Amino acid sequence: MNGLSTLLERASARRHALSRDELVALLGLADPGEIAALRAAAYAVKVRHSGRLVSLRGIIEMGNVCAKDCYYCGIRKGNDCVGRFELDEEAVLRAVRRNIDLRYGSLVLQSGEIASEKHTAFIERILRKIDELGGGAIGVTLSLGEQSEETYARWRAAGAHRYLLRIETSSPELYAKLHPADHSFERRVDCLRLLRKCGYQVGSGVMSGLPGQTLDDLAGDILFFRDLDL
C-alpha cells in the first residue's frame, strides 16, 4: 500500500503525472482496500476541481435514424428490428419548453448521425429557437455524430456550446473490429479536432469491457483524452 499511496499522492498533486505503465497498474487493482484508496483519491481530485455538485442536463432524443452501422449499436443502420422515429420541430420545441419549465440550465440534443442540408438546417432552426426561448441562458450540447467542418461551424454560430462525440476506443485496431471497413478511426479523431477548432467545448468517451480490450487499451484511452485535452 505504501507504493500505491505514493503513486496516488503524486497523481493528486500534479496533472498528467502518471505513465502508461502506472495507469495500467491502477486499472488492474484487485485488492478491495487498494480500490477504495484509488476511489477516494479520485473523488478528492473531483471535489477540488468541481465541488460536491451534481449537474443536471435534459436530454432530448430527437430520433434513431442513423447512417452508421457500428456493430455494437442498437440503432445501427443494418438493424431491421428497431422501429425508427424522427421528432419534428414542434415535438422537439415542446420538449425544450418542458425542460425550461423544469429550470434545467443545460440541454442535450441527440440523434443518430444524419449528414444532409435538410438536417443541418433543421438543427440550426432548433438552436436559434432555444436561444430565443431561453433568453440566451440555456447551454446546449449536441450529440449528432460526424459532420463536416462547415456544419459544425453553422451549428456553433446558431447557439450550440458543447459537442459530445465518443471515440469509443483510442485503439485503431480495436476500433476496426467494432466498425465496418468504411468507418474511419482517423476521421473520428479529425472530427474531434474540427469541433475544437470551431469553438466547442468538446466531450468524448469510450466503452469498457469490450471483447479483446486490454488494460493497456484503457490506459491508452486516458492518455488520448489527455493529449487531446478532452
Q: What are these regions, as identified by a protein language model?
A:
Residues M1-K68:
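Flexible, acidic/Gly-rich N-terminal and inter-domain linker regions that tether
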Residues R15, A42, C70, L165, ...:
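Conserved, mostly hydrophobic/aromatic
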Residues S148-W155, P211-R226:
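Catalytic cores of alpha/beta
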Residues K77-V92, N99-I123, L127-L192, Q201-S208:
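Core AdoMet radical
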Residues R10, L223-L230:
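Short, intrinsically disordered, charge-balanced linker/junction segments flanking boundaries
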